[in-house]
Amino acid sequence: MNEYPKKRKRKTLHPSRYSDSSGISRIADGFNGIFSDHCYSVCSMRQPDLKYFDNKDDDSDTETSNDLPKFADGIKARNRNQNYLVPSPVLRILDHTAFSTEKSADIVICDEECDSPESVNQQTQEESPIEVHTAEDVPIAVEVHAISEDYDIETENNSSESLQDQTDEEPPAKLCKILDKSQALNVTAQQKWPLLRANSSGLYKCELCEFNSKYFSDLKQHMILKHKRTDSNVCRVCKESFSTNMLLIEHAKLHEEDPYICKYCDYKTVIFENLSQHIADTHFSDHLYWCEQCDVQFSSSSELYLHFQEHSCDEQYLCQFCEHETNDPEDLHSHVVNEHACKLIELSDKYNNGEHGQYSLLSKITFDKCKNFFVCQVCGFRSRLHTNVNRHVAIEHTKIFPHVCDDCGKGFSSMLEYCKHLNSHLSEGIYLCQYCEYSTGQIEDLKIHLDFKHSADLPHKCSDCLMRFGNERELISHLPVHETT
């Protein structure tokens, strides 16, 4: 006997020629003679051994042996009425239903050799016929086999020592495991989509969302269309990407546990950019603009623009006694009085009398040795410092007036006289700021001045007039004035 028997060959050309009344050419799907409509590849078709029925034990049930010819007669009757095609061996086995002459729920393991995929391809090209054995009076059992995937895994895990021990023995044939339909479908589906499994209700559920379907093809299409891109699972806070949406949700909880908190108030957020914007808008809104030339801060762009005009002004006031220069006339006068008071008095005397003499203001400053004071002889002002008396004389008794009215051009040596003079222009349409020395002929200019200069100290303003208040309580107490009028 040949140690390596030759494998049976298959026939692919017109397999319907081999289906007749004496043989079965379609796969039975159970023990009741019902034939399945699925396409399967027949791995082997053999005639049962007739001795099995002759050598049966005497203790066996006689009714079983009597029913077997009836079962065979039913099969032959169906084959006479219809011709069934033998499926093509090109199609691989997707699901399998095993049956035998005895009803049993156990999984049957056969020791016959099954064709490998390479041999199937060779036999398909050779187009060799399928050997079909038939019998007139004996039922034919057809076994459909599926090569188990466990075989390849077991053979790969075998060590080299175990292979050497088996060289002297007969080479083992590939074990074929007969699987039911649901098991075979799951094995095939898990080869490409290992995460997608049918649940107990028979539905294929997506593990990334709530989608489910009873067809695996629908779930496969859903995975390609909906979950192909992983860029959508990106954290908006730290920009870290995740493979699934569930991992992203778990990661987002970390940011919720440790939010960004404002150190000036109770504001909280999980995004750092929002916290920065909140601090800039809420806590630093009073001084958002500053001058690059002198680093002076302003609360609005309009106020900064007015400040820029001071730097860009071409008119400069120069000190006639030194190299000091400024664009503010009041600043120049303050400089002259503080630094050059004596020279200012001499210049005033020359302007009035044309010469030094008894009218000289410098001669009006005396020193009281008893009380240790410098005294102004014109008005009696006294001070322990000579420079203070000189400044007093330069401001109060010279003809140079630092405060000049913009409307009429009249000058004043003191701020008090200057303010009194400005009040005289009220009937003529001069608007004065009641919080400082500012005055203007336009009401809109006064409103801009109040918003720019006094908004920080007096944030609460009345909508009916130009009054401003430091707190809301004073504003509320002021509002009844407008109701009575």
Curated annotation (Swiss-Prot):
SMART domains: ZnF_C2H2 (SM00355). It is found in: Nucleus. InterPro entries: Snail/Krueppel_Znf (IPR050527), Znf_C2H2_sf (IPR036236), Znf_C2H2_type (IPR013087). The keyword Nucleus applies. Residues 371-455 are annotated as: Interaction with CTNNA2. Residues 1-20 are annotated as: Disordered. PROSITE patterns: ZINC_FINGER_C2H2_1 (PS00028), ZINC_FINGER_C2H2_2 (PS50157). Coiled coil: none annotated. GO terms for biological process: negative regulation by host of viral transcription; negative regulation of DNA-templated transcription; positive regulation by host of viral transcription; positive regulation of cell growth; positive regulation of transcription by RNA polymerase II; regulation of transcription by RNA polymerase II; symbiont entry into host cell. Residues 1-14 have a biased composition (Basic residues). The keyword DNA-binding applies. It comes from the Eukaryota. Keywords: DNA-binding, Isopeptide bond, Metal-binding, Nucleus, Phosphoprotein, Repeat, Repressor, Transcription, Transcription regulation, Ubl conjugation, Zinc, Zinc-finger. Pfam families: zf-C2H2. There is a cross-link at residues 76, 177, 181, 226 (Glycyl lysine isopeptide (Lys-Gly) (interchain with G-Cter in SUMO2)). A zinc finger (C2H2-type) spans 204-227, 233-255, 260-283, 289-311, 374-397, 403-425, 431-454, 460-482. Interacts with CTNNA2. Binds DNA and may function as a transcriptional repressor. This is Zinc finger protein 639. It comes from Homo sapiens (Human). The gene is ZNF639.
